[in-house]
A protein has these predicted regions:
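Soluble small-group transferase modules, centered on the S-adenosyl donor enzyme superfamily
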Residues: 21-123, 179-186, 249-338
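Membrane-embedded alpha-helical segments of integral membrane proteins
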Residues: 1-24
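The AdoMet/dcAdoMet-binding core of the Class I SAM-like
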Residues: 98-240, 245, 250-251
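Charge-rich, low-complexity amphipathic helices
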Residues: 17-22, 158, 167, 217, ...
Length: 338
């Protein structure tokens, strides 16, 4: 019944139930009572119109507040607010958009070219709004992106958004509806120059399945010696520490851990060249007069901290700050089981 929203389904069931009760009611008094019950149920179902907004914003919700888009599927509910922020089952998934600007959080997927000369084959685990996958599939050097997404509801979202709609028809994209960890286990010989995961919040259920030592070890097995992995630690010291346990070389880029078994050294000239050549749907991803200011992100070398996240740091700073943090494993469930 994924073609029918919860709101519409509630109305259909209400009408069917009311007609059935009216039909079996033996007396006029019973029919009046059924009508009264139906009227009360109508008011209740009518309140569903703002149900998701209320669940999302709770005491901050206001009468008439509406999401710009709501998509329901067997995997849950995807909502988009009027600022293009996307929420999956109530948790923030990011903002729809691909344009890079100075101080933008989108520096993270673009940062791959700051540390590697050539990236041709990329794996994305978790497509969500499609913004990062759109960025990566349009990378000037990339020849193929394999993208794994568990919820096909996000495909409906991508189709409806002009910023990312062309992703689904890009010949460089192979889109797979599956669980990312399962897909890796079933394709042991697959190798990628980069594996990218804008991982969900570390405290959400099942998050440890994408942050644990065992999972990152699986990721490492799908990289060549100089391959790189990038995943969101969502400001969890334990998630960052776990990455340091698995990989010999790490950087922290805002709230993302960038890791490899080969040295990672950002290069401004290399990054500048790639950004200058970058196009999505035929348009530059960044204005020419903003490239230098964006590259100045490389001068912000310090440990990223809440309130000061537009930074990056080397492994030594990560070790000093989080070296004593407990690692996340499949057994201890990380932050899911404090």
């Amino acid at each position: 019944m994924e073609w029918m929203s919860l709101h519409v389904l509630s109305w259909v069931l209400l009408i069917i139930s009311w007609l059935w009760i009216r039909n079996i009611a033996p007396t006029r008094e019973h029919r009046i009572r059924a009508t009264q019950i139906g009227a009360s149920a109508t008011l209740l179902v009518g309140s569903f119109w703002w149900l998701y907004e209320y669940l999302q914003y709770k005491h901050e919700s206001k009468l008439g507040m509406r999401f710009a888009q709501t998509i329901e599927s067997r995997h849950g509910v995807i909502t988009v607010d009027t600022s293009n922020a996307v929420y999956g089952n109530g948790a923030y998934d990011g903002v729809i958009g691909t344009q890079l600007k100075p101080k933008s959080w989108l520096v993270r997927p673009y940062f791959l070219s700051a540390v590697r000369d050539r990236i041709e084959n990329v794996l994305v685990i978790g497509v969500a709004s499609g913004s990062w996958t759109q960025i990566l599939v349009n990378h000037p050097q990339v020849k193929k992106v394999t993208a794994i997404e568990l919820s096909h509801g996000y495909l409906d979202l991508i189709r409806s958004r002009p910023e990312v709609a062309s992703l689904l028809t890009n010949p460089k994209l192979e889109l797979v509806i599956d669980d990312g960890r399962r897909w890796l286990r079933q394709h042991p010989d697959a190798k990628f120059d980069a594996i990218v995961m804008n991982t969900t919040h570390h405290w959400r259920e099942f998050a440890s399945a994408l942050l644990s030592r065992e999972f990152l070890t699986e990721v490492k097995a799908h990289l060549p010696p100089d391959g790189i992995a990038l995943w969101n630690c969502t400001e969890s010291p334990r998630a960052a520490r776990t990455g340091m346990e698995v990989f010999a070389h790490t950087l922290m880029v805002m709230n993302h851990c960038l890791a490899s078994n080969a040295p990672l050294e950002p290069n401004r000239d290399r990054w500048q060249k790639i950004l200058a050549d970058y196009r999505i749907d035929g348009q530059p991803v960044i204005a020419a007069d903003q490239i230098e200011a964006t590259l100045d992100f490389l001068t912000e070398e310090a440990l990223p901290e809440p309130g000061h996240m537009s930074r990056w740091c080397r492994r030594e700073a990560m070790q000093a700050a989080w070296g004593d943090a407990e690692i996340i494993t499949d057994d201890n469930l990380g932050h899911e089981y404090p």
